[in-house]
């Protein structure tokens, strides 16, 4: 079914709340590999969320990036992450891909993306190279790709992927490529403890021939800020949802045992709730800063710090949950066990110490007192 939204009538957060029970209800089976996330993606489409990241001009609301739809984007990712972090991860990649196609695609490419997404197509961004990094060269009628991607999320679910590739001059280019050829996908390498339901793995692009319109933007546009590192607030919003899910599960378990009134257990719940709210404020403010129409490259620092703040909140909350519930939360089938595995895996990032160091240097170079870093002219 092809959808188009009425921007002034569509409530993305309400739509996320509507589908959340279905996503949560299927999460355990998806983690065990008994079902795929196909039904979840269809639910997102029928609720209007798949086309929501499209610009208003294309039948969406610009969810997560257009003014007026950024705060809603934070809450949508948070609600989805609370229901099933694997689904939220795929949706975040979809939002990122739609935004990149809108930022850098030709008019023809944007129209193609809009048609596909309104029809329910899930998009993704695949940036991690495999043993043979993806390269591109020009052919007579377009470009030809070679090499492969790893950690490609949503194999069998993603229809169009934004893929990074190195051109003959050593620059990174973005390419919009079809991703639904099962012969090119290989999930066998995805032997991980968390985020198993994302159907990730390797994707071989060798010999893939595409029109020149498949190129998005110019050389190294992929790394332009605040759209590159600045976009990590979306990861953090999804992760925050999982932290909230852990906190809710702790409260439910303690209440069932009649232990929520115990002063030590109540304090653990309160500390977890405080961590959630602190993280939420970090993410919301980072999103509004980065996605502002006049955002400068330096605003990406706030998003990096928000992601690190969420990682700290996650670590602190997992400690509180472990102390509150003990061994019960480590039994297979307990909601906390699965959510913790997914969250712990998703939190992993390359060189977090380097990210913190770079952010600290950027902060130190700012003028004015600490409390005015983000508000001073």
PLM features: residue spans?
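Glycine-rich flavin
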Residues: 36-46, 50-153, 157
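C-terminal helix-coil-helix/basic helical segment that borders enzyme active sites and/or dimer interfaces
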Residues: 24-32, 255, 278-309, 319-330
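Glycine-rich beta->alpha junctions and the first turn(s) of the following alpha-helix
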Residues: 192-277
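Glycine-rich phosphate/cofactor-binding loops in nucleotide/flavin-utilizing enzymes
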Residues: 328-377
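Register-specific recognition of a single heptad position within extended alpha-helical repeats
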Residues: 3, 7-10, 227, 234, ...
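Generic structural signal for well-ordered, non-transmembrane alpha-helical segments
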Residues: 241, 270-277, 304, 308-315, ...
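A short core secondary-structure module
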Residues: 151-185
């Amino acid at each position: 079914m092809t959808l188009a939204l009425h921007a002034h009538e569509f409530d993305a957060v309400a739509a996320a709340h509507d589908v959340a029970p279905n996503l949560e209800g299927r999460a355990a089976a998806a983690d065990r590999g008994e079902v795929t996330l196909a039904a979840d993606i269809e639910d997102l489409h029928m609720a209007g969320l798949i086309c929501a990241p499209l610009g208003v001009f294309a039948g969406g609301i610009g969810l997560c990036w257009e003014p007026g739809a950024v705060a809603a984007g934070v809450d949508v990712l948070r609600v989805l992450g609370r229901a099933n972090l694997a689904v939220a991860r795929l949706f975040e990649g979809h939002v990122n891909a739609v935004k990149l196609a809108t930022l850098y695609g030709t008019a023809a490419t944007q129209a193609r993306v809009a048609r596909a997404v309104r029809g329910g197509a899930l998009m993704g961004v695949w940036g991690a190279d495999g043993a043979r990094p993806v390269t591109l060269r020009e052919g007579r009628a377009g470009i030809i790709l070679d090499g492969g991607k790893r950690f490609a999320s949503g194999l069998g679910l993603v229809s169009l992927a934004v893929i990074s590739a190195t051109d003959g001059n050593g620059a990174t280019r973005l390419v919009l490529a079809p991703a639904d050829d099962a012969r090119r996908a290989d999930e066998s390498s995805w032997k991980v403890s968390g985020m198993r339901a994302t159907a990730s793995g390797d994707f071989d692009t060798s010999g893939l021939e595409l029109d020149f319109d498949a190129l998005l933007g110019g050389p190294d546009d992929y790394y332009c800020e605040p759209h590159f590192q600045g976009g990590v607030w979306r990861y953090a919003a999804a992760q925050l949802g999982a932290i909230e899910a852990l906190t809710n599960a702790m409260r439910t378990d303690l209440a069932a045992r009649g232990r929520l009134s115990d002063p030590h257990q109540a304090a653990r719940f309160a500390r977890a709730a405080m961590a959630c709210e602190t993280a939420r404020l970090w993410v919301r403010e980072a999103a509004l800063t980065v996605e502002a129409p006049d955002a400068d490259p330096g605003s990406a620092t706030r998003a990096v710090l928000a992601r690190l703040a969420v990682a700290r909140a996650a670590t602190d909350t997992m400690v509180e949950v472990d102390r509150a519930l003990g061994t019960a939360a480590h039994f297979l089938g307990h909601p906390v066990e699965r959510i913790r595995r997914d969250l712990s895996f998703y939190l992993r990032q390359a060189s977090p110490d380097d990210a913190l160091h770079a952010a600290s240097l950027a902060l130190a170079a700012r003028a004015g007192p600490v409390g005015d870093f983000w508000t001073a002219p």
